[in-house]
Amino acid sequence: MKMDVSVRAAGCSDDLSSGEADVDPKLLELTADEEKCRSIRRQYRQLMYCVRQNREDIVSSANNSLTEALEEANVLFDGVSRTREAALDARFLVMASDLGKEKAKQLNSDMNFFNQLAFCDFLFLFVGLNWMEGDPDKLSDCDDSIALSFWKAIEKEATSWMVKAETFHFVFGSFKLERSAPKPRLEHQKKVRKMEENGNMPTKLQKLDLSSYPEATEKNVERILGLLQTYFRKYPDTPVSYFEFVIDPNSFSRTVENIFYVSFIVRDGFARIRLDEDRLPILEPMNVNQMGEGNDSSCHGRKQGVISLTLQEWKNIVAAFEISEAMITYSSY
């Protein structure tokens, strides 16, 4: 909403040039939010300025100035809703982390110092041998009973702090660098001998004559080609749907085999695959003239047509085309 506002010189009131109009509540809300954000930014800048001015006191002294500054920043962060204020909060956190790092470096810690003499004196006092502090020469006069009582007292106190004794890790094997030769296994030979003794050996194949068996792929391709040519002779002007010809609704594996065999028929030029008006693949016969057209982009010629087909796609095609019976049967195979 766009308004023309004229301010009087006296500053008493604002008059709208377009006449009397009500101020949009959303505009008032945006103005109030802007004032609130401006106040938060001002307080962040004042807080960072105070921390910079008192940097040496915060680092050197043991007061809680840094903690108080962090608490004040947390209170300010509750009202942060925009990126500008969040950036100021991030800058203050970086400054506070640097100060905390410097204060940590100045801490005096005696954790790494260990006085052996003082520790021994504490042990003597603990077991009740404080009389040794007055005359160190009496150490030479200690008999075995005093030493035994000393170690028993130490053992009793130490075992009370242990839930269980430490386990001993055994080392197995040889320490020699050279590896010993592996022993031969005789299990397989024993099994073969047992099978020979029991007479359970399978019949051995003496000779395989492949000449008496025609190649299965060539045989199936010729049989499917005969089915396709029979259909073309019966319906010379009607191409057959590719999916209806190769899909076997009762067997996914047979469908894959049919696709494989039909690809050889397409490769040898006895049929071709093209898309119909519905963009679905169809099979149609090839005559001599079409087989000779090498420049026709619609003629696939000697190309072998193979498609990928998943089990779910096969189920969808069977349902969509309502295929109930396979055109390629394997009854005589």
Curated annotation (Swiss-Prot):
Signal peptide start-end: none
Superkingdom as given in the UniProt entry: Eukaryota
Tissue expression per record: Highly expressed in testis.
Subcellular location(s) per record: Nucleus; Cytoplasm; Chromosome, Telomere
GO cellular component terms listed in the entry, alphabetical order: chromosome, telomeric region; cytoplasm; nucleolus; nucleoplasm; nucleus; Smc5-Smc6 complex
InterPro entries given in the database record: Nse4/EID, Nse4_C, Nse4_Nse3-bd
GO biological process: chromatin looping; DNA repair; double-strand break repair via homologous recombination; protein sumoylation; regulation of telomere maintenance
Record flagged with keyword DNA damage: yes
Coiled coil location: none
Major site of localization recorded for this protein: nucleus
Entry annotated with the keyword Repressor: yes
Keywords, sorted A to Z: Chromosome, Cytoplasm, DNA damage, DNA recombination, DNA repair, Nucleus, Repressor, Telomere, Transcription, Transcription regulation
Subunit composition and interactions: Component of the SMC5-SMC6 complex which consists at least of SMC5, SMC6, NSMCE2, NSMCE1, NSMCE4A or EID3 and NSMCE3; EID3 seems to be a testis-specific subunit. NSMCE1, NSMCE4A or EID3 and NSMCE3 probably form a subcomplex that bridges the head domains of the SMC5:SMC6 heterodimer. Homodimer, and heterodimer with EID2. Interacts with the C-terminal region of CREBBP.
Entry similarity comment: Belongs to the NSE4 family.
Its biological purpose: Tissue-specific component of the SMC5-SMC6 complex, a complex involved in repair of DNA double-strand breaks by homologous recombination. The complex may promote sister chromatid homologous recombination by recruiting the SMC1-SMC3 cohesin complex to double-strand breaks. The complex is required for telomere maintenance via recombination and mediates sumoylation of shelterin complex (telosome) components.
Protein name: EP300-interacting inhibitor of differentiation 3
UniProt source species: Homo sapiens (Human)
